[in-house]
């Protein structure tokens, strides 16, 4: 066999055994652990196939029908399908599906609608916002005069009066609504009214709840915001990537120019193929059933935890995620994250509003139901998971460094549970 023939015929196992080994171990991890990281999900085999397709070979700078390279006929077909499907999904007039991530989508909006030094107003990271919404370590916090709003100390709900006060005082060019750890619905109409009162543009980052919105279980921000950004994974259950929506043609032109050539070069066409497949899946009736299960499972998990004496930030959830305050249990986020992983449950440590712990420690964890719901878990399974989490909590209270016997027993139950709901 010639070198050329082997290049195209050898499998990954034949060509790169160490990488193949790592991938197999990661597959086994995903198969045998309960994934409760709220920003993660499990894609369909169809999405995997699209993302692993020959489109990974293709450069396609520009947009459908206006490329800077030849040979883009089929790339155009794929991107056009992705655009049409996401517009239909969210009832939007214009869409850009090229951003490589949600952060890139947010950056493109800022490049299009603001200039360095402008004032932007977003939710603080401490209150549940995202790095890209003006946090000091991020570009948005370095290039802009970033003002941050938070939550009410008593209710832990977004303090809309504070949002309005800050907007009136600082006159931002851009107001950002969205979060990475907030379990309640957002009042997009109120955000828009505040933005209009000071002449600001409103950007909604719906990354976490895009699937919930697509299923019609949350108000659609496209009806209120000047521009909407999102990731394609999380509750949308697609590949890792981003997109931008708007109903304003002039803003759409600015967004397109900001994404390319302003922020990115060639789009990742194999990822856009995966996005198109995921958008198509989300347009099917069964996706609404899936989201209904995600929401029901989150409520069920929350009720079990509350019954076990766990404090939930805001007292519960309206979406797919729960923010757990560990202080009443005398536990830390890092400690719990590690113990749960040893027990076969993956989550992430997370700061809670007004947290006094370092971000590397935290006083909370964030839990989400999308991934485990994808593999078929229902209310009964999430109630079982809730009870197992409580067992780990109580064992940690007695043994702060971890109770290996409890963790091993819980791990055995988790393995049996996952074995009933296989993936891939």
From Swiss-Prot:
Reactions the enzyme catalyzes: (6R)-5,10-methylene-5,6,7,8-tetrahydrofolate + glycine + H2O = (6S)-5,6,7,8-tetrahydrofolate + L-serine
Cofactor: pyridoxal 5'-phosphate
EC number(s) stated in the UniProt entry for this protein: 2.1.2.1
Protein localization: Cytoplasm
Record GO biological process: glycine biosynthetic process from serine; tetrahydrofolate interconversion
An annotated GO cellular component: cytosol
Keyword match Cytoplasm: yes
Site for Plays an important role in substrate specificity, residues: 233
InterPro entries for the chain: PyrdxlP-dep_Trfase, PyrdxlP-dep_Trfase_major, PyrdxlP-dep_Trfase_small, Ser_HO-MeTrfase, Ser_HO-MeTrfase-like, Ser_HO-MeTrfase_PLP_BS, SHMT-like_dom
Chief localisation class: cytoplasm
Pathway the protein contributes to: One-carbon metabolism; tetrahydrofolate interconversion; Amino-acid biosynthesis; glycine biosynthesis; glycine from L-serine: step 1/1
Residues engaged in binding (6S)-5,6,7,8-tetrahydrofolate: 125, 129-131, 250
Molecular functions per Gene Ontology: glycine hydroxymethyltransferase activity; pyridoxal phosphate binding
Keywords per UniProt: Amino-acid biosynthesis, Cytoplasm, One-carbon metabolism, Plasmid, Pyridoxal phosphate, Transferase
PTM annotation (N6-(pyridoxal phosphate)lysine): residues: 234
Family indicated by similarity: Belongs to the SHMT family.
Chain's role: Catalyzes the reversible interconversion of serine and glycine with tetrahydrofolate (THF) serving as the one-carbon carrier. This reaction serves as the major source of one-carbon groups required for the biosynthesis of purines, thymidylate, methionine, and other important biomolecules. Also exhibits THF-independent aldolase activity toward beta-hydroxyamino acids, producing glycine and aldehydes, via a retro-aldol mechanism.
Assembly information from the UniProt record: Homodimer.
Name of the protein: Serine hydroxymethyltransferase 2
Organism annotation: Ralstonia nicotianae (strain ATCC BAA-1114 / GMI1000) (Ralstonia solanacearum)
Lineage: Bacteria, Pseudomonadati, Pseudomonadota, Betaproteobacteria, Burkholderiales
């Amino acid at each position: 066999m010639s070198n050329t023939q082997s290049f195209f015929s050898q499998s990954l196992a034949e060509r790169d055994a160490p990488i193949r080994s790592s991938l197999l171990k990661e597959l086994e991890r995903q198969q045998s652990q309960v994934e409760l990281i709220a920003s993660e999900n499990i894609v369909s085999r169809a999405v995997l196939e699209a993302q692993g397709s020959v489109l990974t070979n293709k450069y396609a700078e520009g947009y459908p029908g206006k490329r800077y390279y030849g040979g883009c006929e089929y790339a155009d077909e794929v991107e056009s399908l992705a655009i049409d499907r996401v517009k239909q999904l969210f009832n939007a007039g214009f869409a850009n599906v090229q951003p490589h991530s949600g952060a890139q989508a947010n950056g493109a909006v800022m490049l299009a609608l603001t200039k360095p030094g402008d004032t932007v107003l977003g939710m603080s990271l401490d209150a549940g916002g995202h790095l890209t919404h003006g946090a000091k370590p991020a570009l948005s916090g370095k290039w802009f005069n970033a003002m941050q709003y938070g939550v009410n100390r008593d209710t832990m709900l977004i303090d809309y009066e504070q949002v309005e006060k800050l907007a009136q005082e600082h006159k931002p060019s851009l107001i950002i609504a969205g979060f990475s750890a907030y379990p309640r619905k957002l009042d997009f109409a109120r955000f828009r009214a505040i933005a209009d009162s000071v002449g600001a543009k409103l950007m909604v980052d719906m990354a976490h709840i895009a699937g919930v919105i697509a299923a019609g279980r949350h108000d659609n921000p496209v009806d209120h915001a000047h521009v909407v950004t999102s990731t394609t994974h999380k509750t949308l259950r697609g590949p890792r990537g981003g997109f931008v929506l708007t109903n304003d043609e002039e803003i759409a032109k600015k967004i397109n120019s900001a994404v390319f050539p302003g922020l990115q070069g060639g789009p990742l066409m194999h990822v856009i193929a995966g996005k198109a497949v995921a958008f198509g899946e989300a347009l099917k009736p069964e996706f609404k059933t899936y989201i209904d299960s995600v929401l029901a499972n989150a409520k069920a998990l929350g009720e079990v935890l509350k019954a076990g004496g766990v404090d939930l930030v805001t007292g519960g959830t309206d979406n797919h995620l729960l923010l757990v305050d560990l202080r009443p249990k005398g536990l830390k986020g890092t400690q719990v994250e590690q113990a749960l992983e040893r027990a076969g449950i993956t989550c992430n440590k997370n700061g809670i509003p007004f947290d006094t712990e370092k971000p590397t420690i935290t006083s909370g964890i964030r839990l989400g139901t999308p991934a485990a719901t994808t593999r078929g878990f229902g209310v009964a399974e999430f109630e079982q998971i809730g009870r197992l989490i409580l067992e780990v909590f109580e064992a940690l209270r007695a043994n702060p460094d971890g109770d290996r016997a409890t963790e091993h027993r819980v791990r055995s139950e988790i393995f049996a549970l996952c074995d009933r709901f296989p993936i891939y």
